[in-house]
UniProtKB/Swiss-Prot annotation:
The RING-type zinc finger domain is responsible for E3 ubiquitin ligase activity. GO terms for biological process: ERAD pathway; protein polyubiquitination; protein ubiquitination; response to unfolded protein; retrograde protein transport, ER to cytosol; ubiquitin-dependent protein catabolic process. Residues 1-6, 78-94 are lumenal. This is E3 ubiquitin-protein ligase TM129. It comes from Homo sapiens. The chain crosses the membrane at residues 7-27, 57-77, 95-115. A zinc finger (RING-type) spans 285-350.
Amino acid sequence: MDSPEVTFTLAYLVFAVCFVFTPNEFHAAGLTVQNLLSGWLGSEDAAFVPFHLRRTAATLLCHSLLPLGYYVGMCLAASEKRLHALSQAPEAWRLFLLLAVTLPSIACILIYYWSRDRWACHPLARTLALYALPQSGWQAVASSVNTEFRRIDKFATGAPGARVIVTDTWVMKVTTYRVHVAQQQDVHLTVTESRQHELSPDSNLPVQLLTIRVASTNPAVQAFDIWLNSTEYGELCEKLRAPIRRAAHVVIHQSLGDLFLETFASLVEVNPAYSVPSSQELEACIGCMQTRASVKLVKTCQEAATGECQQCYCRPMWCLTCMGKWFASRQDPLRPDTWLASRVPCPTCRARFCILDVCTVR
């Protein structure tokens, strides 16, 4: 392929991926379906359900048009291929055009089916209909959802493609093509998994993401998973009526201090171990008096007199958890991004040390 064709292909691929997954830069620039079609979609705050009925349909149609947009662009970027003349276009490009036309055609048929009887066939409307009283329809349930969404005390978090919204009555997950809805009184919530990420793109700090399974007692309501930062777990529990069950292997860190202690321990584990002389007996940690002392401060600089760290001559007196809590207590709470690289004084002799100087004893 020649240079213009390659350049356009790469540029369009990047645009298509960003348009579908919408990073923060695209949101800031207004290059989203919600912003481009805001006049037709209306306001989410004013009418949550009607907004997402139209948004999911518009998103499906716009995304299905991306292959056709690529073909039209290639007609201009690679004019020598004569793609605009179907009879002269290569066989592979004609097959691609067939696919590019088929996708939006199927999307249009599906959207038409959804919109029948005032959107009664839409998956969101059909889910709401499961909660409707015999003498009312799904519109009455939608009105209740709209009212609760407008309240300022709702719980809302997550990225635009996987938002989690909890109101007084409803648990909802808003994705690119669908809105999952379940009634609080009918659901069982279970924390099934926790994943530790070393760095958060927003704060350069470790972050723990929880996977919570939302399963309704009504078999007709499809179960779904929501993803949540562990620091928001407590706020979610306050909004829910029922307790959240937890799998046996899942440990939840609800505070920044919990996350730091786990990271602190993992970093200390890779430091060189300190061998305790056979004549020395380890005593109980003077911080908690519950476990034996398990760490020793050893300056790791090659030259003992150089660097900001200082040699500590104290015997092992602290356990790993208490030393981590001491380290965290000496940090600036407004600058958590500096915690791992900082130096603090020894709790006993005040010699300054960093995380690299904390060694486990053996």
